[in-house]
Amino acid sequence: MELFIARAEALDSDFSSGGENLSAIAAICRHLDGIPLAIEFAAARTATLGLEEVAAGLRDRFALLSSGRRAAVPRHRTLRTTLDWSYDLLPEPEQRLLRHLAIFAAGFTLPAAAAVVDDADGIEAQVAYGISSLVHKSLVTLDRSTSTTRWNLLETIRAYALEKLAAHDEIGAAMRRHAKFYRHLFASRGLDSYVPGEDMDQFTREIDNVRAALDWSFSSAGDAEIGVTLTAAYVPAWLHAALPTECRERTERAMNNLASGMNVSVPLRMQLHFAFGLMPAYTMSPVEPAKAALAKALALAEQIGDLQAQFQILWGLWVLNSESGECHTAYSVTEQLALVARRVGDPSASLMVERLRGFTLQMQGPHQQARECSEHVVRHYTAPTDRRLTAWGQFDQRVLARAMLARALWFQGYAEQAMDQARLSLEEAQRTNFLLSIGEALRVAVSDIALMTGDLETADQSITLLFEIATSRNAPFWGIFGRCLRGKLLVIRGEFAQGSALLGTELEFCERAGWPIWYPEFMCAMAEGLAGLGEIAEARATVEKGLASADHGGERSYCPELLRLRGELLLRQAIGQPWSGAEQDFSAALRVARRQGALALELRAALSLARLRVTQARHDEARRILTPIYDRFTEGFGTADLRAARGMLEALPS
């Protein structure tokens, strides 16, 4: 009764709940079984019909519903009867409006409602009046959670109105107008007009309406041309929302329905091919069709002379090649990008190229060059003036540059600075609230550097966070990468069986799909796990596979570790006297690490060679190998490798 009175008084300041009215209100609430929604409908009607008329109308309805039966009316029938009563009281234009508003899956704006009801000019004023009336009658709700004016229907009312829409055979026409409205809303925007954080949030709010429009468009009763255009136009919103799997699935469906005679503009065709080609980098779907799609997108961009699009598509090609271990090709793409960046004329584009070059160099091995590239971006990067350079995805270039700077610093032997930069990259990413940037900071820097420095607690926490992001955004790439990192963590903890099995499963999947992500590093971890189980032959085969992958694609930053581990495995096989082969591998690891400027890996190789010298009772030589390398370190003395080196030096006889 309090709900009824509050609602009635809100709509009619003269409403009185005293005297006989109180008993009438009680009777109405009893009829409605205390169902809040039904009570709101009835209270809303008192402002126009009066209390007695509402009570009488409901009495008549329920008398018909329960005539001939002694049982009480079920609660769902009570609500249905109330809805019928409220709907029948509406004038015909409002009935039609309510039916059509049910098309919207996630609320609507006035222009959207007007387009779905009737796309004729001048209809908005009539629709606005009708919506206001339906709000007054509690059939439509004003959405107060957004800055723009939106309304929605409660699901109970929407389901009821959809039934009515179907009964009037109006669903097909309404869905067509609905899909055409959203196609126009997004396709009419210039590709350089999206503003991340401003209208992107407004557009992602429409995602359920877009999903409904696309489902209809590609149905047997739909219009595939509308669906193809809408899919292509909505790509930036999917990327902004960090929904790569959905973007790939939707673009794949659109590509399968794309016909040569369709009226789809060249820029939108280009955008569709670009999205289809880029998304496998996040979803781990086959890489070769993705490269073909990007090649087609690049040709279209060149055809229309769109430099910004050429830049973005080349960036996509860099992503595909760098994440599939093709560092040679990735570096060549950065050279193409540099040429286009100069023509684009936006300084941030050139800095982005510098960041990509630094990433590629770091994976190839020259860590000082990689560090210089990353430091330059961290110091000088500013947000691009071209809006489209940020509309394609939520990446903060400074965050990613700082993450790669952290890796370069670790390889160079600056573990504490590396940990600081990794932490800063994550903090900056979290301030932007860009999930893609957060995920990259976690996978590239925080998790792996924690593993490399022996901070297993931080590694565990950051890998868990990476999994949470991968799950929330249905992003298989991060999930697979997270499981590889988890496998590496398990091996370091000594859980060899679980760790090597997890790595084996994930790397086998990656290989089948054409995505050997960070193969040399993860193959090294897997080989260590197999060695821990005593499966030396299989561990050696895994090392050889890692070295072959590094040689093929140019991802050589972990070659010193693979060479060192091969030497350790030779020693453990105990076939004859494997010292000579092990010495060669340890010496090769030292040479490669020194050439790359990887002091951290030089120390590991020196430790292995020094241990060998100890077993040969050549203690002075062991000290001569280890001391000069240990003395080059200026920080990180609490990390696992430096503790091991110090322990060995202290144990050697003087």
What do these predicted ranges mean?
Residues 540-546, 555-565, 585:
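C-terminal structural cap/anchor segments
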Residues 1-246, 252:
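Aliphatic-rich helical/repeat scaffold segments used for oligomerization and domain docking
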Residues 267-269, 346-347, 383-398, 430-436, ...:
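Intrinsically disordered, low-complexity acidic/Ser/Thr-rich segments used as protein-protein interaction/activation
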Residues 42, 382-383:
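Phospho-regulated, Ser/Thr/Pro-rich intrinsically disordered or coiled-coil terminal scaffolds
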Residues 141, 163-348, 352-380, 406-420, ...:
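Inter-helical turn/loop elements of alpha-helical hairpins
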Residues 398-400, 439-440, 477-481, 517-523, ...:
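Generic helix N-cap/helix-start motif at coil->alpha-helix transitions
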Residues 340-343, 427-432, 467-475, 507-516, ...:
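Solenoid-like repeat scaffolds
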Residues 481-496, 525:
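A conserved active-site cap/scaffold subdomain adjacent to cofactor or substrate pockets
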